[in-house]
A protein has these predicted regions:
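N-terminal, positively charged/glycine-rich alpha-helical extensions of SAM-dependent methyltransferases
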Residues: 1-26
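Class I SAM-dependent methyltransferase SAM/SAH-binding core
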Residues: 64, 72-117
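Conserved class I S-adenosyl-L-methionine
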Residues: 59-67
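Glycine-rich phosphate-binding loop signature in dinucleotide/nucleotide-binding domains
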Residues: 120-122
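A conserved beta-strand element that flanks and buttresses the S-adenosyl-L-methionine
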Residues: 128
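Conserved alpha-helix/loop element of class I SAM-dependent methyltransferases that forms part
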Residues: 31-59
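Conserved acidic residues
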Residues: 125
Length: 129
């Protein structure tokens, strides 16, 4: 059994260069992303009983972002101090995400893998998908 849909991977691979264009095809996602991040942070704060501001809120948290695409969730989590691993089945998405995070001086471990291929002994505090 696999979670990989080859047509979906190809569709997002074809759009890979658009991920960080706020006026491009992912414009609605960029507009929605701040709300999505706030929602995720609210759930994390609630689950882990965290309080305080955002500065280093996620310090020492291990986060796995499954289907990370261009890194639109991975990057904000890393900015908040998390150790982020982003995986995506599209090699092109991983290249775009890696270049963008390097450009922004963020340490994110991006891997071109599916969840089944990850086979990690590492434990994650938070898994996003």
């Amino acid at each position: 059994m696999t979670t990989i849909n080859k047509e979906e991977i190809q569709k997002f691979s074809n759009l890979a260069d658009e991920w960080w264009d706020v006026k491009g095809k992912f414009k609605p996602l960029h507009m929605f992303n701040p709300i999505r991040i706030e929602y995720i942070l609210g759930k994390i704060k609630q689950h882990f009983n965290l309080s305080g501001g955002k500065n280093n809120l996620l310090k020492n948290f291990e986060i796995l972002d499954i289907g990370c695409g261009g890194g639109l969730i991975s990057e904000p989590m890393a900015r908040l101090g998390a150790n982020v691993t982003g995986i995506d089945a599209s090699e092109k998405n991983i290249k775009v995400a890696s270049l963008h995070s390097e450009k922004n001086k963020l340490k994110i471990n991006y891997l071109n893998k599916s969840p089944e291929q990850l086979n990690s002994q590492k434990k994650y505090d938070i898994i996003l998908s």
